[in-house]
Amino acid sequence: SALKILAEDFTPLPVYGVVDPGAQAAAVQADASGVLVLATESTILGGAYQRALLRENPSLPVYGRACPLWVTLAEQGWVGDQATSLTQHALKHGLRGFLREAPQRSMQAPQQPKTVLLGCTHFPVFRKQIEALVGADVQVVDSAQTTAITVSDDLSKLGLLRDGPAANHEMVFLATDGVARFRKVGGYFFGGPLRNVSLVDL
């Protein structure tokens, strides 16, 4: 995988992916009803989250749902206060049939998985709307957030986590294509304009 290659190339620097932290957190929270993974089509077809979840719990029912339109909506900024009826319709469409995909037990009616894993780093911008749609009894796990927690914990263990105020901190962003677009889209996720964006050639 690309993560494995990068980890080898950048040793001893740690390289993180979002799949394992997200899967680990979802597996911990999940019950026998299983986990519904929401991600892009390529991620679902690739099966990375499904494999990672089953490594954590081989008996865990895992369901995948590709939601490619959500990425487009997020990148166009149709989120939060800018969300439209189209956004709401697309979210409902992405969750369609999700009650019917859960396992049947003793010929009883299908049950809704009680854990939803946001398997794309674009999807947290829709988290509140997704939580409202799936109901309060469903746990929504954000793979991006769990990855950030993992990185923070590791930095703390290594004594590299910054303590105290972050007034003098500086964020640097590296983009492999389209700096202007990266700034625009990134602003939706960071809640403001991005500075210090540089184009890099990999």
Residue ranges and their predicted role:
Residues S1-L202:
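Non-catalytic structural scaffold of enzyme domains
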